[in-house]
From Swiss-Prot:
Species: Pseudomonas fluorescens (strain SBW25)
Keywords: Cell inner membrane, Cell membrane, Ion channel, Ion transport, Membrane, Metal-binding, Sodium, Transmembrane, Transmembrane helix, Transport
GO annotation terms (biological process): cellular detoxification of fluoride
UniProt keyword annotation of Coiled coil present: no
Protein's recorded name: Fluoride-specific ion channel FluC
Primary location class: membrane
Regulation of catalytic or functional activity: Na(+) is not transported, but it plays an essential structural role and its presence is essential for fluoride channel function.
Residues engaged in binding Na(+): 76, 79
An example Gene Ontology molecular-function term: fluoride channel activity
Topological type in the membrane: Multi-pass membrane protein
Lineage: Bacteria, Pseudomonadati, Pseudomonadota, Gammaproteobacteria, Pseudomonadales
Role description: Fluoride-specific ion channel. Important for reducing fluoride concentration in the cell, thus reducing its toxicity.
Family: Belongs to the fluoride channel Fluc/FEX (TC 1.A.43) family.
Subcellular location: Cell inner membrane
GO cellular component: plasma membrane
Amino acid sequence: MFKTILAVSAAGIAGTLLRFAAGTWVSANWPKHFYAATLAVNLVGCLIIGLLYGWFLLRPEVPIEIRAGLIVGFVGGLTTFSSFSLDTLRLLESGQALIAFGYLGISVFGGLLATWAGLSLTKL
């Protein structure tokens, strides 16, 4: 378990630093397009998590430390949107379309509502 925690932590640092670097670079070069870094890391993260998930399905012998380190740590540090996308896709693939679309809708609209509520609370 300690090796898994260490792998997730180390890879998480790398993913987080990459996300920070992307945001810093975009802010310095295109300040009006601040959202571009988030969009880029979300899309790249989705591509990476899809590749890793598919690769790990084909290679069950890959140790849990590597699996968790790369998916939970690195990709999770880079973006949590990729995990959300994979969860939705897995629900669809398992024939649970109603749950998948409910999850999608609640995540997006609930997230926007929760963010608005949090911002509103700071104005009280």
